[in-house]
From Swiss-Prot:
Species of the source: Pseudomonas aeruginosa (strain ATCC 15692 / DSM 22644 / CIP 104116 / JCM 14847 / LMG 12228 / 1C / PRS 101 / PAO1)
UniProt record similarity statement: Belongs to the UPF0270 family.
Organism taxonomic ancestry: Bacteria, Pseudomonadati, Pseudomonadota, Gammaproteobacteria, Pseudomonadales
Domain of life (superkingdom): Bacteria
Protein known as: UPF0270 protein PA3463
InterPro entries found in the cross-reference section: UPF0270 (IPR010648), YehU-like_sf (IPR036685)
Pfam families: UPF0270 (PF06794)
Amino acid sequence: MLIPHDLLEADTLNNLLEDFVTREGTDNGDETPLDVRVERARHALRRGEAVILFDPESQQCQLMLRSEVPAELLRD
């Protein structure tokens, strides 16, 4: 299920983005400050390049590139 980022409270969205950009495997040795990485992710959401996907089975949210989301989920 896609979650529209603009419907989330500002703090909730920020916490979600911080969680995503600090997950193991997302920094790839990048020494970019946390606030810059969060803003990059936020900008990708605003441009429509990324989406927030909620998996009800695992109760987890993922930030994904729109191009990587299965087409059937984008139609919902």
